[in-house]
Regions:
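Glycine-rich hexapeptide-repeat left-handed beta-helix
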Residues: 13-20, 24-28, 36-131
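Short proline/glycine- and basic residue-enriched helix-capping loop/turn segments at helix->loop/beta transitions
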Residues: 33
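Sequence/structural signature of small/polar-enriched beta-strand/turn repeats
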Residues: 2-6, 25-30
Length: 131
């Protein structure tokens, strides 16, 4: 299996990504934000989804577009977070529906991190840049 990462996705420090041999790959869509120290294990994160810091997403899980898993949460194997919902806790459960403003922030977050990446790239000496 494989790990695929979409464009403008932000995977923060100490995040770990894995596949489950013979079962599931890890598929991360476009404009996804994954917080520090998250564990992304053989799951699917659809476009513009959000995983909080130190959250764990287990085998076969799906976080749909515009959905959020809160910081420190554990999403048990095979669970699906529907679009527009916030889940949190151990094990993770639905907390509430997200507001439209919160869902729109996911794209703003992706924009900010993409801009930071470009700013950082400008500061790297030319001889160290990859083509």
């Amino acid at each position: 299996h494989e790990i695929r990462i979409g464009s403008r996705t932000n995977i923060q420090d100490l995040t770990m990504g894995h596949v489950a041999k013979g079962k599931f790959g890890t598929y991360i869509g476009d404009d996804v934000t994954i917080g520090h120290s998250a564990v992304i294990h053989a799951c699917t994160l659809e476009d513009r989804s959000f995983v909080g810091m130190s959250a764990t997403v287990m085998d076969g899980c799906v976080i749909e577009q515009g959905a959020m898993l809160g910081a420190g949460a554990l999403l048990a194997p095979g669970k699906r977070i529907p679009a527009g919902e916030l889940w949190a806790g151990v094990p993770a459960r639905k907390v509430r529906d997200l507001t439209q403003e919160e869902i729109e922030f996911f794209e703003v977050s992706a924009d900010r991190y993409a801009d930071l990446a470009q700013e950082y790239r400008v500061t790297i000496p030319d001889d160290l840049k990859s083509e």
